[in-house]
Structure formats: C-alpha cells, structure tokens
Amino acid sequence: MLNATWLDTFTTLCETGHFTRAAERLNMTQPGVSQHLRKLEAQLGQSLIAREGKSFTLTAAGEAVFALGRARRNEEKHLRAALETDDRDAGEVRIACSGSFAMLLYPVLLPWMRAAPGLAIHLQAAPQADILAGLLDGRFDLGVLGADPGHARLEARHLGREELCLVLPADAPDRVPGFADLDARGFVAHPDGYAYADDLLNLNFPGAYPGADRMRIRAYVNQIGQIPAPVAEGIGYTLLPHSGIEAFARKDRLRVVPLPQRRWHALWLAARRGRPLPARLKHARDLIVTSAGQLK
C-alpha cells in the first residue's frame, strides 16, 4: 500500500508545479518535499518526474500516480461530505425479527422506501439466536427479540408484548374447544408451531395434550405469510403470535379463540451499545415502535 503522506506530497507537487510552492502549501521544507518524492519513487521502483532545470515533467508512471492522488482526494472529499450529512432517506438499514413481526412491519416500511430512492432496507426474518448473533457481529443494525438479551455489548428497549393465539376458521363455534375438538380438526404446523403447541396447549389442556410429536397434523406451511391460509379455508387450526394474524390479508376469515390460560411473548428492540444511531436508523426504530404499538 502506498504511503499516504508521500502520495499527498507528490500530488501537491504536481498541482503546484514547483518544489518551493509545494513546500509552502504543505508547511514543509523544500528538501522535505524532495525526500518524500524519493521515498515514493523507491517504494514504486519507478521515476515519477523528469527534471528540466528548475522545472520538471511527469513520467508515464508519474501521470498514473498523480491521477491516483487526485482520485484519493476526491474520495476523501465525498467521504467528509457524507459524514457531515446525516440523511434520513439515504443509506442502508438492516433489521432482523421474527417472521410474524416482519409481516406486520414490512407494510409500515414500504411508504418510506417508496419516498426515498436512496434508501436500501434489508428486513430479515430469522430465529432468535441468529438475530442475537447478527446484532453482535454487525450484520444487523436493529433486531426485535423475544426477551431482553442481557448482553454487555447490546442495549435493549422493551416494546411491549404480543399474545400467542389459538386460530380457528371464522365459522368455528364461539367457545373454548376441548383438545379433542382441536385434534379432530388437525394442526396446521409451521417451523415455530411445535414449540408454540408445547407452550400454549400444554398450559391449557394438561391432561389431554399428548405433546407436539403426537398431535394430528393436517398441513405443514413453511411460509410465514401463508400459515393462516388453510385455516381461513376451514382447514384445521394453528397457533400464531398476534402479529402474524394482524398482517394476514384475510383475517376476517379467522377466529381467535381466547383460552383460559393466556400466554404472552415479550418484544424487545436491540442494537449495539454505544453506537450513535444515524437519522435513518432512528426513523427505522420509530417505525418498529409504531408497529409494535399495533399489537396492544
């Protein structure tokens, strides 16, 4: 890698066309400018100037190095301008959350994206462990977690909580079913569904619930946005956080049946500790808070 100081001295020399003027601009001595030139030539193994009395011309190598020096200065100028301008509507935003919360959040992000062509938002649905790891290694700027991460390198804010819901077709009886009734319908399973069942169904049907591995499975859906679809068509039942129901386009064809023992999942917004948030991340944070507020 070229020595940045020597390159800057050489670029100034080329701009002024004179050793004395270059030394004055850089607040150096003329021998100091000559020394930087010699060191840069030694580093490259090429002569950069051809002397003609008190003046000089650039060699082919010198022309190339001068072009590099000017390009470096332009890059630095653009960098300084970017650092001084904290534009809410430009740059990259990387968010990770559960699939159900992503369904709720994405429609809230779309108007902002439409109004800000310079903005790139990456919203990733991920398991809790991946969200935590991604926040720590810098892959994600913001993450929505199901618990306070309690990590020294992260700071977290409690957003609220959302209920884990039993979801039936809209024409299901408006009463709490027994587990035998649910099993007769069959479970619409999904990646998180088995853990939800062991949590909510075991809590409410302790004598009848046989465990997730023994439930009658009617369907398995791996796309978070389509999990309620079979239930909306009268097929089976499922378990989802409230956000997964609110974001479903045909939620009028679903019935959420409150169970005697209710289960709530916490929502925490986490980011790297000590990192000042630029304007775009502050706005993304505010939109996440707004989305979480829909679940109250």
Language model feature labels by segment:
Residues 7, 37, 43-44, 65-87:
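Alpha-helical linker/hinge and terminal dimerization helices associated
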Residues 11-28:
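Short helix-boundary/capping micro-motifs
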Residues 41-60:
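A short LG(V/I)-centered, amphipathic sequence patch enriched
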Residues 90-152:
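Central regulatory/effector-binding core of bacterial HTH transcription factors
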Residues 104, 173, 235, 255-296:
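A late-sequence structural motif
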Residues 156-193:
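Flexible hinge/capping segments at coil-to-helix
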Residues 184-210:
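Secondary-structure junction motif
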